[in-house]
Curated annotation (Swiss-Prot):
<keyword id="KW-0153">Cholesterol metabolism</keyword>
<feature type="modified residue" description="Phosphoserine">
    <location>
        <position position="132"/>
    </location>
</feature>
<dbReference type="GO" id="GO:0051015">
    <property type="term" value="F:actin filament binding"/>
</dbReference>
<dbReference type="GO" id="GO:0005925">
    <property type="term" value="C:focal adhesion"/>
</dbReference>
<dbReference type="GO" id="GO:1902018">
    <property type="term" value="P:negative regulation of cilium assembly"/>
</dbReference>
<dbReference type="InterPro" id="IPR028740">
    <property type="entry name" value="EPLIN_Lim_dom"/>
</dbReference>
<feature type="compositionally biased region" description="Basic and acidic residues">
    <location>
        <begin position="143"/>
        <end position="152"/>
    </location>
</feature>
<feature type="compositionally biased region" description="Basic and acidic residues">
    <location>
        <begin position="630"/>
        <end position="666"/>
    </location>
</feature>
<feature type="region of interest" description="Disordered">
    <location>
        <begin position="682"/>
        <end position="703"/>
    </location>
</feature>
<feature type="modified residue" description="Phosphoserine">
    <location>
        <position position="263"/>
    </location>
</feature>
<dbReference type="GO" id="GO:0015629">
    <property type="term" value="C:actin cytoskeleton"/>
</dbReference>
<comment type="function">
    <text>Actin-binding protein involved in actin cytoskeleton regulation and dynamics. Increases the number and size of actin stress fibers and inhibits membrane ruffling. Inhibits actin filament depolymerization. Bundles actin filaments, delays filament nucleation and reduces formation of branched filaments. Acts as a negative regulator of primary cilium formation. Plays a role in cholesterol homeostasis. Influences plasma cholesterol levels through regulation of intestinal cholesterol absorption.</text>
</comment>
<keyword id="KW-0965">Cell junction</keyword>
<feature type="modified residue" description="Phosphoserine">
    <location>
        <position position="720"/>
    </location>
</feature>
<dbReference type="GO" id="GO:0031526">
    <property type="term" value="C:brush border membrane"/>
</dbReference>
<keyword id="KW-0007">Acetylation</keyword>
<feature type="compositionally biased region" description="Polar residues">
    <location>
        <begin position="363"/>
        <end position="375"/>
    </location>
</feature>
Length: 753
């Protein structure tokens, strides 16, 4: 239509004529059947306008013509060949289509709907979509068929329609989305009888709805002026129709209007809009909330379009949706006072989307994070920073290990002694230091070495030899504890990271000490072998001596010299036990053997004490009754060595009883020498004085021994013991030494025998 300055007469109710050309522009890709069907209606409407023009020859220009429903009904039911005249008006209406291009409306597309009512419905529903209030939209769509001359008369009819529309407008919102899903090319001709339309217009109720119609008309005019729309309004009043018929027609009109844009929207958006419409119908009180939801839906819908409309069109489109809701509330409540308030709200809300739209591309989603910022902050709150006790680096949750009320890295949780990796089930701790269980038992439980854990001087330092070198080595080992403690306040004594260094220094000290003392390798381990094993022989004694040197000096060094002698005695006693059979066989010759062993110190420690157990009795017999014994031996010279041995045994045993006194007296004298501290020279003089009566017999005795030594000792494999045995004075001197040594441990020897 031509663009004309705004005139309130335009708001009466203008023609519903949307030209076929306009429809073809809007629905380029759709079938031409829509245009053909609509052109049929246009012909009927045009004829009705012509009749009205005849009745009112001085009427306003052609685009203000209006027709009554009765005439339209007749023309629709009985189409007359007036298409030529109707098409003459198409250029005029094409200008109307060009003016309303702001709102891409596929309006009224496939409504073969019955009569004017169907056309009116088709054009009312698009308007909530594309701009300004429903009245304004409707008026802008159909500007021509009304005659403003009959403004008041038409107003009454349109009031009826508005009243009916107000009741049914909520219902019209529901099928909004379902009809969108239908195929656009589907065309249906509705069988709604026009009698009902006629009845609706011919009924009264003019006074009842007049005030409401006036208010809505004025509000629509204001809204339309804001949107630069000079179109007139055609109010639809199909409220008295059955809801099913009205809804179906409404759906078809809505579908045709939204074809250009809704084809690009998703089903979800349309369903959301449908639910919003349902909620609007249910509670007018929730009007404000509904406006917000519809506004957000509109934002989202527009953002999903491939080619969004211009800012003016978008704002008009949003305003249209809001205006529809306000109009619904106004009509349903039929309260005139609410209209101005709602209009002001609509204006403010229509102005708002112009600015927030570019700012919030996701109007609905952006509002959600704002509503719950506190929850998200709590969820993602960073944990407190923790540092590892050992390496002093940050510990993150995935590598955190809490043990002994301290925080470690899993890889740093190691034994402070052997540096083996530990777990919560394999560690033991003492005052902040972590140990593996074997070393904890070895270092503390077996030795009672708890002082080491408390930072005191370690027992190993006390056990080691107290030399200056060791003390200098021991002192530097301690300062790291004091120097490193400030770095880790969580640990009581010293940081676990440095315990390995202490252990290494102690091991280095111990190894150097071992090298100086020729310690065997076993001494590194903290083992105690006490008392020494009794089964070891001569080779075992050397090993025991090595162990004694290598192990810690305990008991103190003052007692070491005392402990050596008992060990020698034990070794002698063990060897005597082993040679018990030899002692019995060689008893006749033990006097010489005892003197020889005392005089000659063999490298072995066992030789001087081989016959110690019975040498004392034989020596006493030698001094007390040596002559008689030797004479008997000479008489038995011719006998075999085995027989002599047996006889000698029996005789020696028989003679031991009467001669015990001599033996005891000699022993007392020798003990007196020891007690008085007499030197070896005095002992020798005393022995010579004591043995002087026996000297005349000595040559014979020695000769006897020389003759029999070769036989007796060779048979017993003792040649080495017989060589150089009788050397006179030397033998006697060393025999006293042997006696002194023997008398010291006399009681033990007596028990062994």
């Amino acid at each position: 239509m031509e663009s004309t300055p705004f005139n309130r007469r335009q708001w009466t109710s203008l023609s519903l004529r949307v030209t076929a050309k306009e429809l073809s522009l809007v629905n380029k890709n759709k079938s031409s059947a829509i245009v053909e069907i609509f052109s049929k209606y246009q012909k009927a409407a045009e004829e009705a306008n012509m009749e009205r023009k005849k009745n009112n020859p001085e009427s306003l220009p052609q685009h203000f013509r209006r027709g009554t429903l009765s005439v339209l009904k007749k023309k629709w039911e009985n189409p007359v060949a007036g298409a030529e005249f109707h098409t003459d008006s198409l250029p005029n209406s094409s200008s109307e289509g060009g003016h309303t291009a702001d709102y891409p409306p596929a309006e009224v597309t496939d409504k073969p709907a019955p009569g004017v009512r169907a056309d009116r419905e088709e054009h009312t529903q698009p308007k909530p979509r594309f701009g300004s209030r429903p009245e304004a939209v409707i008026q802008s769509r159909y500007p021509r068929s009304e005659n403003s001359h009959d403004f008041k008369a038409q107003a009454t009819e349109s009031q009826k329609m508005e009243n009916c529309l107000g009741d049914s407008r909520h219902e019209a919102e529901k099928p909004e989305t379902s009809e969108n899903t239908e195929t656009s090319g589907k065309i249906e001709k509705y069988n709604v009888p026009l009698n009902r339309l006629k009845m609706m217009f011919e009924k009264g109720e003019h006074n009842q709805t007049k005030s409401l119609w006036t208010q809505s008309r004025n509000a629509g005019g204001r809204r339309l002026s804001e949107n630069n729309c000079s179109l007139d309004d055609w109010e639809i009043g199909a409220g008295h129709l059955s809801s099913s018929a009205f809804n179906s027609e409404k759906n078809e009109s809505k579908r045709n209007l939204e074809l250009p844009r809704l084809s690009e929207t998703s089903i979800k958006d349309r369903m959301a809009k449908y639910q919003a419409a349902v909620s609007k119908q249910s509670s007018p009180a929730s009007y404000t909330n509904e406006l917000k939801t519809s506004e957000s839906k509109t934002h989202k819908w527009e953002q999903k379009e491939n080619v969004p409309p211009g800012p003016e069109a978008c704002s008009v489109h949003q305003e249209g949706s809001k205006v529809s809701t306000t109009e619904n509330s106004l009509v349903a409540l039929s309260v005139p006072a609410e209209d101005d308030t709602c209009n002001s709200q609509v204006k403010s809300e229509a102005q708002q989307p112009m600015h927030p739209k570019p700012l919030s591309p996701d109007a609905r989603t952006s509002s959600l994070p704002e509503s719950s910022p506190s929850k998200t902050a709590k969820k993602f709150q960073a944990p407190a920073k923790e540092s590892c006790v050992e390496c002093q680096k940050t510990v993150y949750p995935m590598e955190r290990l809490l043990a002994n009320q301290q925080v470690f890295h899993i890889s740093c949780f190691r034994c402070s002694y052997c540096n083996n990796k530990l777990s919560l089930g394999t560690y033991a701790s003492l005052h902040g230091r972590i140990y593996c269980k074997p070393h904890f038992n070895q270092l503390f439980k077996s030795k009672g070495n708890y002082d080491e854990g408390f930072g005191h001087k370690q027992h190993k330092d006390l056990w080691a030899s107290k030399s200056d070198n060791e003390e200098t080595l021991g002192r530097p080992a301690q300062p790291p504890n004091a120097g490193e403690s400030p770095h880790s306040p969580g640990v009581e004594d010293a940081p676990i990271a440095k315990v390995g260094v202490l252990a290494a220094s102690m091991e280095a000290k111990a190894s150097s000490q071992r090298e100086r003392e020729d310690k065997p390798a076993e001494t590194k381990k903290l083992r105690i072998a006490w008392p020494p094993p009794a089964e070891l022989g001569g080779s075992g004694s050397a090993l025991e001596e090595g162990i004694k040197v290598s192990k810690p000096k305990w008991p103190p060094e003052d007692d070491v010299c005392k402990t050596e002698a008992p060990e020698d005695v034990d070794l002698d006693l063990k060897k005597l036990r082993r040679s018990s059979s030899l002692k019995e066989r060689s008893r006749p010759f033990t006097v010489a053997a005892s003197f020889r062993t005392s005089s000659i110190k063999s490298p072995k420690a066992s030789s001087p004490s081989l016959r110690k157990g019975w040498s004392e009795s034989e020596q006493s017999e030698e001094f007390g009754g040596g002559i008689a014994t030797m004479e008997r031996k000479q008489t038995e010279n011719a006998r075999p060595s085995g027989e002599k041995e047996n006889v000698g045994k029996s005789r020696w045993q028989g003679e031991e009883v009467p001669r015990s006194k001599d033996r005891s007296s000699f022993e007392l004298e020798s003990e007196n020498f020891m007690e008085n501290g007499a030197n070896i020279a005095e002992d020798d003089n005393h022995v010579h004085a004591q043995q002087s009566p026996l000297e005349p017999e000595a040559p014979g005795w020695s000769g006897f021994v020389d003759t029999t030594a070769a036989k007796e000792f060779t048979t017993q494999n003792q040649k080495s013991q017989d060589v150089g045995f009788w050397e006179g004075e030397v033998v006697r001197e060393l025999s006293v030494e042997e006696q002194i040594k023997r008398n010291r441990y006399y009681d033990e020897d007596e028990d062994e025998e």
